[in-house]
From Swiss-Prot:
Keyword ATP-binding applies: no
Entry protein name: UDP-N-acetylglucosamine 1-carboxyvinyltransferase
GO molecular function, one term: UDP-N-acetylglucosamine 1-carboxyvinyltransferase activity
Sites bearing 2-(S-cysteinyl)pyruvic acid O-phosphothioketal, chain numbering: C117
Family: Belongs to the EPSP synthase family. MurA subfamily.
Task of the protein: Cell wall formation. Adds enolpyruvyl to UDP-N-acetylglucosamine.
Species of origin: Actinobacillus pleuropneumoniae serotype 3 (strain JL03)
Length: 424
């Protein structure tokens, strides 16, 4: 099993080129199944979850190729298989996005119930009910969700009982080829939904309202080829800004957009950090100052993103003062706190709230990553702790951060990957 060995404390400073967003790349890759012609995607991050998506697409009969420049060509014109199998789907919850494009274009699709990070309940019910309202028949059989339709799906008014990024994307994809108009109310507003809509429209879809809570899709008969650049990863951006804030450094994130990260930037400024933005850069200068504690409440976009909660937990455990962090999106998403406490942090969990008592310094320890965002907070903790920290189960990080140790070394971290022969 691979681990990271991280030495500290070090100040993290420099410039980081931000990768394409995993949370846009995955739905866009699955949405390419809707097209009868090849599509070309650029700025696709080199990640485990992207590789898994390639494997699922190839199982369906899609031709997927990545060239030397990193551009990805996808040709879904000869799909001959409609099942996303358990052995691939089990590692990644995003696999559910294979279902809507298959049933929309081919009137049948089958996806194993998905896996991924262990952070509480993420039911697929809203994906399923959306497809049912559009005329699909859904069966659950031996761990698989099977969707069929008698001809084209039909447009429908779909109200989301809970704001759901995943279900909004599923319904939006399916509706592009449906007969008639579909309206999604109480839709998620994340930038990755906007990017997916831009991609679908480039293929000939008729989507309006993405980025608001009401999305309207007029169905078309077919979608064609296009070229599209994946939006920058706002969570990777926020992660590196926090790296500067907790280490007393100054970091510029290049190739990113501040308007996708307003809630995070506001909280960093509240923590006493100087943040400056240009059209495609964000710079955080801590001026060597310890951050001030900030209260956080995770919310759907444009609120504070749940995927930045673990990083701000780290900020708060080394900040001046006491803070409360309330997690409203996912259950069981404070598993990093006991690990940070092993490093000398003072964090308490009360239901869906964490209380952080800031300490001046962390000390090294052997810690275990539990999910994607928790794992990066432990790596950053290792960068600012005295001594050698070992971070176990780093496969979580490879699912969502491209070339992370290279990027961290580029801003002054001392980090290496190593393997152990036996899993304890």
């Amino acid at each position: 099993m691979e681990k990271f060995r991280v030495h500290g404390p070090f100040t993290l400073s420099g410039t980081v080129d931000i990768s394409g967003a995993k949370n846009a790349a995955l739905p866009i890759l699955f949405a390419a199944v809707l097209a009868t012609e090849p599509v070309t995607l650029t700025n696709v991050p080199d990640l485990k979850d992207v590789d898994t998506t390639f494997k699922i697409l190839r199982k369906l009969g899609v031709v997927v190729e990545r060239d030397e420049s990193g551009a990805v060509q996808i040709d879904a014109s000869k799909i001959d298989h409609y099942v996303a199998p358990y052995e691939l789907v089990k590692t990644m919850r995003a696999s559910i996005w294979a279902l809507a494009p298959l049933v929309a274009r081919f009137h049948e699709g089958q996806v194993s119930l998905p896996g991924g990070c262990t952070i509480g309940a993420r039911p697929v019910d809203m994906h399923i009910s959306g497809l049912e309202k559009m005329g699909s028949v859904i069966e659950l059989d031996e761990g698989y969700v099977k969707a069929t339709s008698n001809g084209r799906l039909h447009g429908a008014r779909i109200y989301m009982d809970k704001v759901s990024v995943g279900a909004t994307l599923s319904v939006m994809m399916a509706a592009t080829l449906a007969e008639g108009t579909t309206t999604i109310e109480n839709a998620a507003r994340e930038p990755e939904i906007v990017d997916t809509a831009l991609f679908l429209n480039a293929m000939g879809a008729k989507i309006s309202g993405a980025g608001t809570d009401t999305i309207t899709i007029e169905g078309v008969e077919r979608l064609t080829g296009c070229q599209h650049r994946i939006v920058a990863d706002r969570i990777e951006t926020g992660t590196f800004l926090v790296a500067a804030a907790v280490s007393g450094g100054k970091i510029t994130c290049r190739g990113t957009k501040a308007d996708t990260l307003e809630a995070v930037i506001e909280k960093l400024r509240e923590a006493g950090m100087e943040v400056t933005v240009t059209e495609d850069t964000i710079t955080l200068d801590s001026k060597g100052q310890r951050p001030k504690a900030v209260n956080i409440r995770t919310m759907p976009h444009p609120g504070f993103p749940t995927d930045m909660q673990a990083q701000f937990t780290l900020l708060n455990v080394v900040a001046e003062g006491i803070s409360r962090i309330t997690e409203t999106i996912f259950e069981n998403r404070f598993m990093h706190i006991p690990e940070l406490n092993r490093m000398g942090a003072k964090g308490e969990i009360e239901g869906n709230t964490a209380i952080c008592h800031g300490v001046e310094k962390l000390k090294s320890a052997e810690v275990m990553a539990t999910d994607l965002r928790a794992s990066i907070s432990l790596v950053l903790a290792g960068c600012i702790a005295s001594g050698e920290t070992i971070v176990d189960r780093i496969y979580h990080i490879d699912r969502g951060y491209e070339h992370i140790e290279d990027k961290l070394r580029g801003i002054g971290a001392k980090i290496e990957r190593f393997s152990t022969k036996f899993e304890e």
